[in-house]
Amino acid sequence: MKIDSKNRLDIALLILRLGIGFLFILHGYPKMMGGIEKWAGLGSYGMGSLGIHFFPTFWGFMAAFSEFVGGIMVLLGLYIRYFSVLLIITMLVATCSHLVGGDGIMGASHAIESAVVFTCLFILGPGKYSVNINLKQ
């Protein structure tokens, strides 16, 4: 494959999706496999920082799901805009949790950076080299 001005953006999107998707699979897997206790703790910490104390297990599961399944979907480029929204919301909650928890901007920087990446993926879409594009053909 020759890199030229016609496919440069698509190759960059592929590299971005593969990298961030893989990392979110790694981050989300232990949370997803942690079960109910892990989800409840995650939900209590995350949503509790926003003053939301009901259904902590549900919120924790949603965070784990969005990171693990969202990572898979981003890696594949499948339904990327829907999963980008889930991941943006998850990263905004993580940002708030770090800031309220006293970690400061440096503690929240990973979540902020990830939210920026997923915002860009939401705007740009998956690119030409994705499962989503191949399903449409």
Locations of the language-model features?
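Extended, low-polarity transmembrane helix blocks
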Residues: 1-37, 54-65, 69-137
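Perimembrane loop-to-helix junctions flanking transmembrane segments
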Residues: 39-55
